Amino acid sequence: MPNDDAYSKPSAPSEAPQTPGAPPQGKAGGGGGGSGSDSGASGTGAVSGKKSPRLPKCARCRNHGYASPLKGHKRFCMWRDCQCKKCNLIAERQRVMAAQVALRRQQAQEEELGISHPIPLPSTAELMVKRENSSGNPCLMIESSSSSQPPPASTPSTAAPGPEGRMVIQDIPAVTSRGHVENTPDLVSDSTYYSSFYQPSLFPYYNNLYNYPQYPMALAADSSSGDVGNPLGGSPVKNSLRSLPAPYVPGQTGNQWQMKNSENRHAVSSQYRMHSYYPPPSYLGQSMSQIFTFEDSASYSEAKASAFSPPSSQDSGLVSLPSSSPIGNESTKAVLDCESASEPSNFAVAPIIEEDE
């Protein structure tokens, strides 16, 4: 075709240095008479080092001897509907390339989603079949006998005699096309391993309270002190007795009394809860100073701060009193026996309330 040489790369003689006085048209490597000036222009561009970018040309026009740029030419090509041999070959090539581009785009999307992966080699397939056969999977009925041959590299399926003498054919790429089957037994673990990380909350109305081990303290009602009223039927106290540490509570020889009256729920101010050096308030009784008769005097401030820090405003009347105090003997009959266990357990508080005298 005469026009191909006009737009092709200049030949070896044209790349030689130009002799002085020689015309630029003489540097064309070949071509027709009408394209000599164009080839000479391309030769001078090659010598000067400034090559113009190659513009795509219409393939149908090139097949029929014309060179026309492809930009804006597709709708106006004279051989757009040509059915000659060369144009049919071009149309077939365009369809194949479009199908390859679509397939490549689909594979890229599936790899991003983790749906598909490349088909393994026959050696990997044989290893997977042997592993599944050793694990006793009934899906692949392959016996390791002398008559069974390993699958050849060209065929993707394996044939082995079954127990009844029939041939069982399994397609290996179909088995391995759903995720990484050979790595599945190593990656899947027991669900109980993950369930141990997430513990259900003991208190469904609070997000921060979980069943952490608490002090070994169990509180139960003691009926040996006389007249005991009816216990309150329902759930135990929302906030457990978190104020007193465990070593001091079983150290008391007497019973621990709980004063919780619905009429005497005083909200202790923040200064008595934050600062332990303030004296006890007068409205809580004169015998409040007897609470802090513990064995160790170093824990006085801790016990005093914990005694004056109720868990909430509803339980602000919950005060721990020794059995020798007159308030405990006269005004309340709720007896709570403090027992210490060797292992941590939750508090079980069962308050018993009798009306004020």
From Swiss-Prot:
<keyword id="KW-0805">Transcription regulation</keyword>
<feature type="region of interest" description="Disordered">
    <location>
        <begin position="305"/>
        <end position="340"/>
    </location>
</feature>
<dbReference type="GO" id="GO:0000978">
    <property type="term" value="F:RNA polymerase II cis-regulatory region sequence-specific DNA binding"/>
</dbReference>
<feature type="modified residue" description="Phosphoserine">
    <location>
        <position position="323"/>
    </location>
</feature>
<dbReference type="GO" id="GO:0046872">
    <property type="term" value="F:metal ion binding"/>
</dbReference>
<feature type="compositionally biased region" description="Polar residues">
    <location>
        <begin position="309"/>
        <end position="332"/>
    </location>
</feature>
<dbReference type="GO" id="GO:0046661">
    <property type="term" value="P:male sex differentiation"/>
</dbReference>
<dbReference type="GO" id="GO:0000981">
    <property type="term" value="F:DNA-binding transcription factor activity, RNA polymerase II-specific"/>
</dbReference>
<dbReference type="GO" id="GO:0007548">
    <property type="term" value="P:sex differentiation"/>
</dbReference>
<keyword id="KW-0804">Transcription</keyword>
<keyword id="KW-0678">Repressor</keyword>
<dbReference type="InterPro" id="IPR036407">
    <property type="entry name" value="DM_DNA-bd_sf"/>
</dbReference>
<dbReference type="GO" id="GO:0000987">
    <property type="term" value="F:cis-regulatory region sequence-specific DNA binding"/>
</dbReference>
<keyword id="KW-0539">Nucleus</keyword>
<keyword id="KW-0010">Activator</keyword>
<dbReference type="GO" id="GO:0045840">
    <property type="term" value="P:positive regulation of mitotic nuclear division"/>
</dbReference>
<comment type="similarity">
    <text>Belongs to the DMRT family.</text>
</comment>
<feature type="region of interest" description="Disordered">
    <location>
        <begin position="138"/>
        <end position="164"/>
    </location>
</feature>
<dbReference type="GO" id="GO:0002176">
    <property type="term" value="P:male germ cell proliferation"/>
</dbReference>
<keyword id="KW-0479">Metal-binding</keyword>
<keyword id="KW-0862">Zinc</keyword>
<feature type="compositionally biased region" description="Gly residues">
    <location>
        <begin position="27"/>
        <end position="37"/>
    </location>
</feature>
<comment type="function">
    <text>Transcription factor that plays a key role in male sex determination and differentiation by controlling testis development and male germ cell proliferation. Plays a central role in spermatogonia by inhibiting meiosis in undifferentiated spermatogonia and promoting mitosis, leading to spermatogonial development and allowing abundant and continuous production of sperm.</text>
</comment>
<dbReference type="GO" id="GO:0006357">
    <property type="term" value="P:regulation of transcription by RNA polymerase II"/>
</dbReference>
<dbReference type="GO" id="GO:0045835">
    <property type="term" value="P:negative regulation of meiotic nuclear division"/>
</dbReference>
<keyword id="KW-0597">Phosphoprotein</keyword>
<dbReference type="GO" id="GO:0045944">
    <property type="term" value="P:positive regulation of transcription by RNA polymerase II"/>
</dbReference>
<dbReference type="GO" id="GO:0005634">
    <property type="term" value="C:nucleus"/>
</dbReference>
<dbReference type="Pfam" id="PF12374">
    <property type="entry name" value="Dmrt1"/>
</dbReference>
<dbReference type="GO" id="GO:0060008">
    <property type="term" value="P:Sertoli cell differentiation"/>
</dbReference>
<feature type="DNA-binding region" description="DM">
    <location>
        <begin position="58"/>
        <end position="105"/>
    </location>
</feature>
<dbReference type="InterPro" id="IPR026607">
    <property type="entry name" value="DMRT"/>
</dbReference>
<dbReference type="GO" id="GO:0030238">
    <property type="term" value="P:male sex determination"/>
</dbReference>
<keyword id="KW-0221">Differentiation</keyword>
<feature type="compositionally biased region" description="Low complexity">
    <location>
        <begin position="38"/>
        <end position="50"/>
    </location>
</feature>
<keyword id="KW-0726">Sexual differentiation</keyword>
<dbReference type="InterPro" id="IPR001275">
    <property type="entry name" value="DM_DNA-bd"/>
</dbReference>
<protein>
    <recommendedName>
        <fullName>Doublesex and mab-3 related transcription factor 1</fullName>
    </recommendedName>
</protein>
<dbReference type="InterPro" id="IPR022114">
    <property type="entry name" value="DMRT1-like"/>
</dbReference>
<dbReference type="Pfam" id="PF00751">
    <property type="entry name" value="DM"/>
</dbReference>
<feature type="region of interest" description="Disordered">
    <location>
        <begin position="1"/>
        <end position="54"/>
    </location>
</feature>
<keyword id="KW-0217">Developmental protein</keyword>
